């Protein structure tokens, strides 16, 4: 059950970052799945890219937020970014203009003005968070360039 402890302590196990651990946990998922479903009420998500124990709290607490985020808009941007990534294949590249066009099209309420520094800064915080979490990789350019109103190339992990 060492693998269960690993799943409890980590957000996810990415195959691209640790193949040995990914396959070790994947081999044990059959035993773990029944236990966590029956006893903990959790689900295990496993696919060709990652293994994750879905740990959703019954009552959310203040400390459970994302420390880098300072506004509700950043959480909205993250959700829309995740929607955008769902339509992409692993390792597929995109440029920030594609993302901002998508976000503008699906954003609830008023249209986001990407010429405003504050809006670009919030998106950069979200992108930096997704890079830290291994969801995307920057392959060309920097996020600082985007804040100065230019384009960068992003790579989906």
Go through each PLM region and give its residues.
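Eukaryotic partner-binding/assembly regions in large regulatory complexes
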Residues: 1-67
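Short capping segments at the starts of secondary-structure elements
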Residues: 2-8, 88-95
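Positively charged, polyanion-binding regions of nucleic-acid-associated proteins
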Residues: 73-93
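Short acidic, hydrophobic short linear motifs in intrinsically disordered regions
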Residues: 90-110
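A short, conserved structural fragment
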Residues: 131-141
């Amino acid at each position: 059950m060492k693998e269960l402890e690993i799943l409890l302590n980590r957000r996810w196990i990415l195959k691209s970052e640790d193949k040995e651990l990914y396959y070790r946990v994947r081999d044990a998922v059959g035993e773990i799945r029944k236990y966590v479903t029956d006893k903990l009420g959790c689900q295990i998500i496993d696919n060709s890219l990652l293994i994750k124990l879905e740990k959703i709290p019954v009552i959310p607490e203040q400390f459970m937020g994302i420390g880098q985020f300072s506004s509700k808009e950043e959480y909205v941007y993250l959700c829309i970014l995740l929607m955008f990534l769902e339509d992409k294949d692993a390792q597929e590249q995109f440029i920030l203009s594609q993302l901002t066009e998508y976000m503008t099209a699906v954003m609830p309420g008023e249209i986001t003005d990407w010429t405003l520094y504050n809006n670009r800064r919030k998106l950069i915080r979200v992108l930096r968070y997704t890079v830290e979490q291994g969801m995307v990789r920057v392959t060309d350019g920097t996020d600082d360039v985007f804040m100065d109103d230019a384009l960068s190339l992003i790579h989906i992990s």
